[in-house]
Structures are given as structure tokens and as C-alpha cells.
A protein has these predicted regions:
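Hydrophobic N-terminal alpha-helices or hydrophobic patches in metabolic proteins across all domains
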Residues: 1-104
Length: 104
């Protein structure tokens, strides 16, 4: 999820940095949502870790992830929130897995 003060077109590429991760269960399967901030967004680039976000923004994200698949009759549960360091580790692991599977 990219927190941005501007509207972004679907499939846009935006230079971002991770501030945290929301771990959840999506229809019974583990799912991790990396929360990112655009490098050049003056509204949000003051935040370096998910713990710094205003409570209402954090609550909106958690609520969204808890209901966003309701129309598909699928259950989602927000489980845990982890910091920037954990999100960065997940991104690095995913890059390594991509290289292993698609670049050799």
C-alpha cells in the first residue's frame, strides 16, 4: 500500500520506501502488506516508521484490510503490525526469491 497525498493511476511506478508491514490472514492464508511512502510526497515523507503515523491513518488502513474482501465473501483478519526494519527484510527476501526463480 502506498500512502500518498496525490491520486495514483493503477499500475503506476512510484519511488517509495517502506515504513512497516501489516501481517494478516487473507481467507485463511498468511499475507503481508508492505506500507510505503513516496520519496517526494511532502505530506507523508516526514514519516519513517509505521509507528509515527497519525492514529486515524493507521486505523483507516487496518479497517480497510479487515473488510476489503467482504464483497467476495472472504474473511480477512489484521494480525500484527511490524516496523520499517521488518518490512525492509521482507522486501529483500522477495527480491532474492524473484532473482532465484526468474533470473537464472
Amino acid at each position: 500500500l502506498v500512502l500518498c497525498s496525490e491520486t495514483l493511476a493503477p499500475l503506476s511506478l512510484v519511488d517509495c520506501y517502506p515504513i512497516g508491514v501489516i501481517s494478516m490472514l487473507d481467507n485463511g492464508a498468511a499475507d503481508e502488506k508492505i506500507i510505503c511512502i513516496p520519496l517526494n510526497d511532502p505530506t507523508y515523507n516526514i514519516y519513517k516508521d509505521i509507528s509515527e503515523l497519525p492514529k486515524h491513518i493507521f486505523d483507516e488502513m487496518c479497517h480497510f484490510f479487515s473488510v476489503y474482501k467482504a464483497l467476495e465473501h472472504k474473511d480477512t483478519v489484521v494480525d500484527d503490525v511490524k516496523d520499517r526494519e521488518h518490512a525492509t527484510e521482507i522486501v529483500a527476501q522477495c527480491i532474492d526469491r524473484y532473482i532465484e526463480n526468474f533470473c537464472k
